[in-house]
C-alpha cells in the first residue's frame, strides 16, 4: 500500500489526471443510467422489430443511410428531428429506437425526443457499427 502512496506523491499530476478521468467516466455512466434511455444490443433491437413494438430512426447523414440501413428504419438527421415531430406523433405508443453511426450521438438525440414527450425512447448501443459487426441484415 505504501508503494501506491509513494507513486501518487511522486507523480501528482499523473495521479490527479487519472482520478479526474475516472470520476468523469463514473459521472457519465451515472448520467446515462439516470436518463431513462435504454441501451439496446443489436439482438434486442431485432427482437423488438420482430414483435413490432418498436420503430427505428436512423440519424446518420442521408448518404450513409442510402448506402446501407436497417430495413424499415426512417432516416431523420439530427438537425431535422424537431421539425419532424409531427411525423413521429403516430408512433408515441411504440418504442422509438435511435440509431447513429457508432452509438455516440444517439443518447443526446434520444434525450431530445424524451423532452418532447416521447416516453419510450431507446438507443442502439454501438450504433450501426454494432449492427454490422453482428452480421445482421441491412437494406441497400
Which residues does each PLM region occupy?
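Rhodanese-like catalytic fold shared by cysteine-dependent sulfurtransferases
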Residues: 1-39, 48, 54, 62-95, ...
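Active-site flanking residues adjacent to catalytic metal/cofactor-binding acidic residues
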Residues: 57
Amino acid at each position: 500500500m505504501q508503494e501506491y502512496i509513494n507513486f501518487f506523491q511522486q507523480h501528482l499530476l499523473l495521479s490527479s489526471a487519472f482520478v479526474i478521468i475516472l470520476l468523469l467516466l463514473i459521472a457519465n455512466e451515472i448520467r446515462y443510467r439516470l436518463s431513462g434511455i435504454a441501451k439496446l444490443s443489436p439482438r434486442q433491437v431485432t427482437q423488438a422489430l420482430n414483435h413490432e413494438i418498436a420503430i427505428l430512426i436512423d440519424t446518420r447523414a442521408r448518404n450513409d443511410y442510402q448506402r446501407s440501413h436497417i430495413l424499415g428504419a426512417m432516416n431523420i438527421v439530427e438537425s431535422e428531428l424537431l421539425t419532424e415531430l409531427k411525423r413521429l406523433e403516430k408512433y408515441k405508443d411504440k418504442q422509438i429506437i435511435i440509431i447513429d453511426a457508432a452509438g455516440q450521438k444517439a443518447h443526446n438525440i434520444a434525450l431530445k425526443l424524451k423532452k418532447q414527450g416521447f416516453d419510450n425512447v431507446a438507443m442502439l448501443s454501438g450504433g450501426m457499427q454494432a449492427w454490422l459487426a453482428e452480421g445482421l441484415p441491412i437494406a441497400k
